[in-house]
Amino acid sequence: MHLARNPALKSIYIKIRKRKTMSIGTALALSAPFAVGLAALGSGLGLGRAVSSAMEAIGRQPEASGKILTTMIIGAALIEALTIYALIVFFVVLEKMA
Protein backbone atom coordinates (compact mmCIF):
# COMPACT_ATOMS: atom_id res chain seq x y z
CA MET A 1 0.00 0.00 0.00
CA HIS A 2 1.14 3.53 -0.69
CA LEU A 3 0.18 5.03 2.64
CA ALA A 4 3.35 7.08 2.93
CA ARG A 5 1.94 9.61 0.48
CA ASN A 6 -1.12 10.38 2.59
CA PRO A 7 -0.41 10.95 6.29
CA ALA A 8 -4.10 10.93 7.22
CA LEU A 9 -4.61 7.46 5.77
CA LYS A 10 -1.39 6.27 7.34
CA SER A 11 -2.52 7.35 10.82
CA ILE A 12 -5.89 5.65 10.36
CA TYR A 13 -4.18 2.48 9.17
CA ILE A 14 -1.83 2.49 12.17
CA LYS A 15 -4.76 2.89 14.58
CA ILE A 16 -6.58 -0.03 12.96
CA ARG A 17 -3.49 -2.25 13.11
CA LYS A 18 -2.97 -1.51 16.81
CA ARG A 19 -6.54 -2.34 17.78
CA LYS A 20 -7.04 -5.25 15.37
CA THR A 21 -10.64 -4.04 15.06
CA MET A 22 -12.17 -0.98 13.51
CA SER A 23 -13.90 1.57 15.72
CA ILE A 24 -17.14 3.24 14.73
CA GLY A 25 -15.36 6.55 14.22
CA THR A 26 -12.86 4.99 11.85
CA ALA A 27 -15.60 3.24 9.92
CA LEU A 28 -17.47 6.54 9.58
CA ALA A 29 -14.31 8.34 8.51
CA LEU A 30 -13.78 5.81 5.74
CA SER A 31 -17.37 5.29 4.61
CA ALA A 32 -18.86 8.81 4.73
CA PRO A 33 -16.81 10.24 1.82
CA PHE A 34 -17.44 7.07 -0.15
CA ALA A 35 -21.21 7.46 0.35
CA VAL A 36 -21.14 11.09 -0.79
CA GLY A 37 -19.15 10.06 -3.85
CA LEU A 38 -21.69 7.39 -4.71
CA ALA A 39 -24.54 9.88 -4.28
CA ALA A 40 -22.79 12.35 -6.59
CA LEU A 41 -22.10 9.62 -9.14
CA GLY A 42 -25.71 8.48 -9.16
CA SER A 43 -26.95 12.03 -9.36
CA GLY A 44 -24.66 12.83 -12.26
CA LEU A 45 -25.69 9.76 -14.20
CA GLY A 46 -29.38 10.39 -13.56
CA LEU A 47 -29.14 14.05 -14.47
CA GLY A 48 -27.28 13.28 -17.67
CA ARG A 49 -29.89 10.75 -18.68
CA ALA A 50 -32.74 13.15 -17.89
CA VAL A 51 -31.23 15.98 -19.92
CA SER A 52 -30.47 13.64 -22.80
CA SER A 53 -34.04 12.39 -22.89
CA ALA A 54 -35.42 15.92 -22.67
CA MET A 55 -33.27 17.11 -25.57
CA GLU A 56 -34.35 14.11 -27.62
CA ALA A 57 -38.01 14.87 -26.86
CA ILE A 58 -37.54 18.52 -27.87
CA GLY A 59 -35.95 17.35 -31.11
CA ARG A 60 -39.02 15.24 -31.85
CA GLN A 61 -41.61 17.84 -30.80
CA PRO A 62 -40.18 21.37 -30.83
CA GLU A 63 -43.60 22.90 -30.16
CA ALA A 64 -43.71 21.22 -26.72
CA SER A 65 -40.29 22.48 -25.66
CA GLY A 66 -41.67 24.75 -22.92
CA LYS A 67 -43.43 21.92 -21.09
CA ILE A 68 -40.53 19.54 -21.58
CA LEU A 69 -37.95 22.00 -20.25
CA THR A 70 -40.11 22.89 -17.25
CA THR A 71 -40.54 19.24 -16.35
CA MET A 72 -36.84 18.56 -16.88
CA ILE A 73 -35.78 21.46 -14.65
CA ILE A 74 -38.09 20.29 -11.85
CA GLY A 75 -36.72 16.76 -12.18
CA ALA A 76 -33.13 18.05 -12.21
CA ALA A 77 -33.78 20.02 -9.03
CA LEU A 78 -35.11 16.90 -7.31
CA ILE A 79 -32.12 14.87 -8.45
CA GLU A 80 -29.68 17.51 -7.21
CA ALA A 81 -31.57 17.75 -3.90
CA LEU A 82 -30.69 14.14 -3.14
CA THR A 83 -27.00 14.90 -3.57
CA ILE A 84 -27.29 17.96 -1.36
CA TYR A 85 -29.01 15.84 1.32
CA ALA A 86 -26.13 13.34 1.14
CA LEU A 87 -23.66 16.20 1.56
CA ILE A 88 -25.59 17.52 4.58
CA VAL A 89 -25.54 14.06 6.16
CA PHE A 90 -21.79 13.91 5.51
CA PHE A 91 -21.24 17.19 7.36
CA VAL A 92 -23.45 16.04 10.25
CA VAL A 93 -21.41 12.83 10.55
CA LEU A 94 -18.20 14.85 10.31
CA GLU A 95 -19.41 17.08 13.14
CA LYS A 96 -20.23 14.04 15.30
CA MET A 97 -16.72 12.69 14.80
CA ALA A 98 -15.01 15.91 15.89
From Swiss-Prot:
The chain crosses the membrane at residues 27-47, 73-93. It is found in: Cell inner membrane. The keyword Cell inner membrane applies. It is a multi-pass membrane protein. GO terms for cellular component: plasma membrane; proton-transporting ATP synthase complex; proton-transporting two-sector ATPase complex, proton-transporting domain. The record marks 80 as: Reversibly protonated during proton transport. Keywords: ATP synthesis, Cell inner membrane, Cell membrane, CF(0), Hydrogen ion transport, Ion transport, Lipid-binding, Membrane, Transmembrane, Transmembrane helix, Transport. GO terms for molecular function: lipid binding; proton-transporting ATP synthase activity, rotational mechanism. SUPFAM superfamilies: F1F0 ATP synthase subunit C. F(1)F(0) ATP synthase produces ATP from ADP in the presence of a proton or sodium gradient. F-type ATPases consist of two structural domains, F(1) containing the extramembraneous catalytic core and F(0) containing the membrane proton channel, linked together by a central stalk and a peripheral stalk. During catalysis, ATP synthesis in the catalytic domain of F(1) is coupled via a rotary mechanism of the central stalk subunits to proton translocation. HAMAP family: ATP_synth_c_bact. F-type ATPases have 2 components, F(1) - the catalytic core - and F(0) - the membrane proton channel. F(1) has five subunits: alpha(3), beta(3), gamma(1), delta(1), epsilon(1). F(0) has three main subunits: a(1), b(2) and c(10-14). The alpha and beta chains form an alternating ring which encloses part of the gamma chain. F(1) is attached to F(0) by a central stalk formed by the gamma and epsilon chains, while a peripheral stalk is formed by the delta and b chains. NCBIfam families: ATP_synt_c. Belongs to the ATPase C chain family. This is ATP synthase subunit c. It comes from Protochlamydia amoebophila (strain UWE25). The lineage of its organism: Bacteria, Pseudomonadati, Chlamydiota, Chlamydiia, Parachlamydiales.
